[in-house]
């Protein structure tokens, strides 16, 4: 698949930009919020976010919500994005669930909705296993469907050297490039070094 022509965004993409300037409140009883803005002349983004963390039944639960209003100066390319997530930490396991939405255009010519769940498990100080599954569609294009599943392992070779191996399987159908369900897979290997 080619991202520029085959799909607009992966289901797990939250579409919340990094603000150029932001304010993060101190935590108040587990609640905090963020305000941010990026001004690029004719294009600007306004970002809001909130987070609440609590401990319950032996687990740490975090609720997250963020919005990003993108004004490009052009009615057809303005964007409105939101991301809602729940993160549950239980022992060595972390479960993340999210729903991401992105509307494009003032009259909304594209309405992407993605949902997914991911799990990570710390096996030892050197090994972490991950897996996730997500699906996405476009409320303005009923022919568009995308699923993405992946598994991975991270291995700390030595302090400062981490090897990551991931494998993804994707299935795509849209109204132009792939009118029938088409599958693809990829495996990537990365070595991260920090000093």
Q: Which residues fall in each region the model found?
A:
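Outer-membrane beta-barrel proteins
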Residues: 1-195
């Amino acid at each position: 698949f080619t991202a520029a022509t085959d799909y607009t965004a992966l289901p797990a993409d939250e579409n919340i930009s990094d603000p150029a300037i932001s304010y993060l409140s101190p935590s108040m009883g587990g609640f905090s919020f963020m305000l941010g803005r990026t001004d690029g002349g004719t294009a600007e983004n306004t970002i809001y976010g909130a987070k609440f963390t609590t401990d319950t039944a032996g687990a740490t639960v975090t609720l997250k919500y963020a919005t990003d209003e993108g004004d490009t100066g052009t009615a057809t390319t303005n964007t409105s994005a939101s991301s809602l997530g729940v993160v549950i930490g239980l022992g060595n396991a972390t479960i993340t669930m999210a729903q991401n939405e992105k509307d494009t255009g003032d009259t909304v010519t594209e309405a992407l909705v993605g949902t997914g769940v991911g799990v990570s498990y710390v096996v030892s100080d050197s090994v972490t296993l991950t897996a996730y599954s997500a699906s996405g569609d476009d409320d303005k294009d009923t022919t568009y469907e995308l699923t993405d599943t992946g598994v991975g392992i991270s291995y700390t070779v030595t302090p400062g050297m981490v090897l990551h191996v991931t494998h993804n399987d994707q299935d795509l159908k849209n109204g132009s490039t792939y009118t029938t369900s088409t599958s693809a897979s990829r495996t990537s290997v990365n070595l991260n070094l920090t000093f």
